[in-house]
């Protein structure tokens, strides 16, 4: 399979919107490409992701929040699909990090609450760590979609009961960073509040990491260190 990088010019740049804050690059990952696209569109406030032929490639679109925060939203393909080759995944990871020129400020792991969380999600999380290194967990936020039937408080009571131990372990490491994200709502206030919750977590991650994003150099160092570790083991 060939790879391509889609980097459209944002509508905000076209309009000449003044941006008063440093750009934040957020990457959407998960098992369901449809879920990733819908979530990305809701963060953008526009239907941008999901165009024909784009599902298997990284794409980036931009938006600016009312308070002047520019956000680059990067959609990844279904990188945790067992039918996708390791070589293809590696190339798309590089494409993703190329799009995030200043580095990745947060990784949003999109999880559907429609069905029981299974070993396939565990495999996806393990794949994420194997590709990016355990350092990526410091930038991880869980977006829990398809939970429209829940109110926030009700969900907080329900979630520990349905959450498997592997996910609880990762959540503890991530300081419990999760957002119940309603992709079906037409309420603009709810939409704005969801994005605000996500960006509050992004700000907390940046503060904890001394404003240092995850960069392509970090990724390449992880690959080099892994290689030499394997050589030493042999």
UniProtKB/Swiss-Prot annotation:
Give a GO cellular-component term.
plasma membrane
Q: Which Pfam families match?
A: AIG1 (PF04548)
GO MF term list:
GTP binding
Query: Does Disulfide bond count among this protein's keywords?
Result: no
Query: What GO biological process, any one, is recorded here?
Result: cellular response to heat
Keywords annotated in UniProt? GTP-binding, Nucleotide-binding
Factors inducing expression: Up-regulated by brassinolides. Down-regulated by 2-aminoethoxyvinylglycine (AVG), high CO(2), isoxaben, and propiconazole treatments.
Q: Which residues does UniProt call coiled coil?
A: none
- All copies of domain AIG1-type G, residue ranges: 21-223
Q: Which residues of this UniProt protein bind GTP?
A: 30-38, 51, 183
- Tissue expression profile of the protein: Mostly expressed in pollen. Also detected in lateral roots and radicles.
Record-stated family? Belongs to the TRAFAC class TrmE-Era-EngA-EngB-Septin-like GTPase superfamily. AIG1/Toc34/Toc159-like paraseptin GTPase family. IAN subfamily.
Query: What PANTHER family does this protein's entry cite?
Result: AIG1-LIKE PROTEIN_ 48352-49494-RELATED, GTPASE, IMAP FAMILY MEMBER-RELATED
Q: Which named protein is this? A: Immune-associated nucleotide-binding protein 2
Q: What species does this protein belong to? A: Arabidopsis thaliana
Name of the coding gene: IAN2
């Amino acid at each position: 399979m060939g790879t391509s990088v889609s980097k459209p010019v944002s509508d905000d740049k076209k309009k000449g919107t003044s941006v008063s804050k440093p750009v934040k690059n957020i990457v959407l990952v998960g098992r369901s490409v449809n879920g990733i696209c819908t979530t990305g569109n809701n963060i953008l406030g526009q239907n941008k992701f999901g165009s024909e032929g784009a599902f298997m490639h990284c794409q980036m679109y931009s938006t600016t929040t009312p308070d002047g925060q520019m956000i680059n939203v990067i959609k990844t393909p279904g990188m945790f699909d067992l039918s996708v080759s390791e070589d293809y995944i590696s190339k798309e990871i590089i494409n993703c990090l190329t799009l995030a020129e200043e580095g990745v400020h947060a990784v949003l792991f999109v999880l559907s609450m429609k069905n029981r969380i299974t070993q396939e999600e565990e495999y996806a999380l393990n794949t994420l760590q194997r590709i990016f290194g355990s350092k990526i967990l410091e930038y991880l936020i869980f977006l829990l979609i398809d939970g429209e039937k829940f109110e926030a408080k009700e969900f907080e009571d329900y979630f520990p009961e349905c959450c498997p131990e592997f996910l609880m372990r990762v959540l503890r490491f991530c300081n419990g960073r999760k957002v119940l994200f309603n992709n079906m709502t037409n309420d603009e206030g709810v939409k704005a509040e969801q994005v605000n919750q996500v960006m509050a977590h992004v700000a907390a991650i940046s503060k904890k990491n001394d404003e240092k994003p995850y960069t392509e150099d970090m990724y390449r160092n992880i690959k080099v260190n892994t290689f030499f570790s394997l050589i030493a083991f042999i």
